[in-house]
Amino acid sequence: MSVLRFLVTRQALAALTRPRTLNIIQNPAQIAYASTLCNQNSNHNAKDLTKSSANLSLMQTRGHKRFGHQEEKTPSVTKYFHMFILSLFLISVMDWGKVKRMLTPKVDADAGQRPSSAADVNGEDKSSESESEDSEDEEAGSDLHLHEGKKIREKVGFRERKIIEYENRIRQFSTPDKVFRYFATIQVPVADDRHEVYMTPTDFLTSMTPGMKQPDGLGLDQYRRYDPKSVGEQLNLHLEKNSIFYKLGSYGLITFSDYIFLLTVLSISRRHFEIAFRMFDLNGDGDVDCEEFEMVATLVRQQTSMGTRHRDHANTGNTFKGVNSALITYFFGPNMDEKLTIEKFLDFQEQLQREILSLEFERKEPNDEGNITEADFAELLLAYAGYPLKKKQKKLKRVKRRFRDHGKGISKQDYLDFFHFLNNINDVDTALTFYHIAGASIDQQTLQHVAKTVAMVNLSDHVVDVVFTIFDENNDNQLSNKEFISVMKNRVQRGLEKPKDTGFLKMMRSVFKCAKETKPVLLDI
């Protein structure tokens, strides 16, 4: 029975899988009719396909860009814009002065002959003057100064300008410890493989003066090694034998404690020192001993922005250890039994200021006659003004243009006399205010009279003329009193009175104090 069922099932499956024979194949008429239907269907499908492809092509042409299969043409406006941007870039980076020198080389009339020494010097002077005039006409901010045919300073590039801005922020906002470590350049070995960092007097000046760039290769914790015990190695500090810096000991070098003390001396006026001395002069004789002087120095240092900002850093070795022992010996004698008078200390302060001014003057490289240019003198006056770069360059260019042809230069004595006049700037401010209230104009003769009356110093006509050129904006030969006084006060104080922070913490402290002391309004309801 099962065998029979198996055979039936296999036969049924074979019948299902066997191809079915069409009867229409055996009839020729039916074959012709079927072929006609197939041709009609194929023609109809071809027409539909052609129509749909045409519609698709039309739709792609109207709405799309063939999906990136066809190269896209750049519009002419875009090409012109790209050419314009590229031209601006090339104009900005190209050294046009060099291009001008290449296209128009200088040809001397006596090129075939060797001129004499005098003619050579005169020729160099004339060519250098013409180069200076061309540079001043081309750029207002050119920093080229000529002394007897010698070029002193080249134009400051982008990299140097950014470094100077960074160093100015260090001077303004950093702690005294970091300022000292950045601008100090000397490292002296001591016992047990340890080293102590020192400043030279030039480093001390650089740490205070904005715009003075630290030499390449020297910076934060980067120093030159110097061994005082080495016979063949000597430091040339360009100081006089009786310099005040040699009284500090350490071969005329400045330690961190000396740095703090000297900044304190420079940042406090004579009047404030006199008051501090009288406060600690218990017997009223005008003298103080060593212990009283330590208290005076501590009190005065705490009143300065530098003193409030300083924190001892034991890990760097920069801790304030009090007044230098060599200075203590200079003030109070080897046995510490002498008294320090206010006159002796003020003489020390005046001598320190005079040496700093001399270093500034010598840094401008005076000519053979010992004079610096009027533009250099203007730069020294405006060093601490805090002007924007364009405003400062405008004033300097006005001075260069004014004294280009008949400049006599500024001697060292005229320079020191003018800054002796500035040491009495508060009294000068009072005197000029009286003139202004009385309705009198402040001309050059008035300023000379005030200097003679207040500071007991005779200002030369040429120095006063340069000062009026700097601060006389409208060329009416009248001094702008407020601007002159504010700039000169900053110059005397060398920016040391400015706070060493951005003011954000002070503002937040004021906000918290106000919120703490103010009663909420809801409590009054």
Curated annotation (Swiss-Prot):
Ca(2+) 2 binds at D472, N474, D476, Q478, E483. The keyword Ion transport applies. Ca(2+) 1 binds at D281, N283, D285, D287, E292. Disulfide bonds: none annotated. It is found in: Mitochondrion intermembrane space; Mitochondrion inner membrane. Pfam families: EF-hand_5, EF-hand_8. Disruption phenotype: RNAi-mediated knockdown results in lethality. RNAi-mediated knockdown in neurons shortens lifespan and severely impairs climbing ability. RNAi-mediated knockdown in the developing eye decreases ommatidia number and disrupts ommatidial array. RNAi-mediated knockdown in neurons and, more specifically, in alpha/beta or gamma mushroom body neurons, impairs mitochondrial calcium entry and decreases intermediate-term memory after conditioning. Does not affect olfactory learning. Residues 268-303, 459-494 form the EF-hand domain. The EF-hand domains have high affinity for calcium and act as sensors of calcium levels. This is Calcium uptake protein 1 homolog, mitochondrial. The lineage of its organism: Eukaryota, Metazoa, Ecdysozoa, Arthropoda, Hexapoda. The gene is MICU1.
